[in-house]
């Protein structure tokens, strides 16, 4: 009987483990995001008879795509960014670039937030040509407006031709771009959470709206930025 009991325990334990693993596998979910490029992902898609030729600067077109994705139960729409004017093919290649005319991502996802209810909106912003405080403020503002539906696609800008648009004659080298990206990402997250939840007291009787003595901690200075909330 003791042997039978042990065998039953082993069988039962293995069975429970199998069922648990199977249930865990079956209950996993996949997140789906719609990658919206203005005129499609094929370079010549805009030439199709049924295409929207001015899709890059046609907000109604983007709104309909986002709303369709939302009805299809997608989790998010994703907006890439291109700021270089001429690629390696020179002016002849530029003539055929459909992304030469497109919305700035943060502006676009802010507008898409207003015409959707549940779907996430993800915008691309490079850390190479921006500053952490400004970036933190932009995304937190959008996150507050749309109820936590915004996302940030962090890139470091690989195209050397983009630097001139920001008044930088020489593109920052690869290692420095990634070090800067890590520093900015850390600072942005710190800025988002730098004040305690109770810091905004809003006491009508005393007239005190904000209590600055309740910080969670000032962000540290880095290699590229001397950040301070004091």
Feature roles, as predicted:
Residues 23-116:
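N-terminal beta1-alpha1-beta2 module of alpha/beta enzyme domains
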Residues 74-81, 121-122, 152-155:
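Short beta-strand segments at enzyme active-site cores
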Residues 28, 131-230:
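Internal, glycine-rich beta/alpha segment that forms the wall or movable "lid"
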Residues 14, 18, 23-25:
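Low-complexity, intrinsically disordered or signal/transmembrane-proximal segments
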Residues 99-103, 128-133:
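Acidic-and-aromatic substrate-binding clefts and catalytic sites of carbohydrate-active enzymes
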Residues 37, 82, 126-128, 155-157:
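Active-site beta-loop-alpha junctions enriched in small/polar residues
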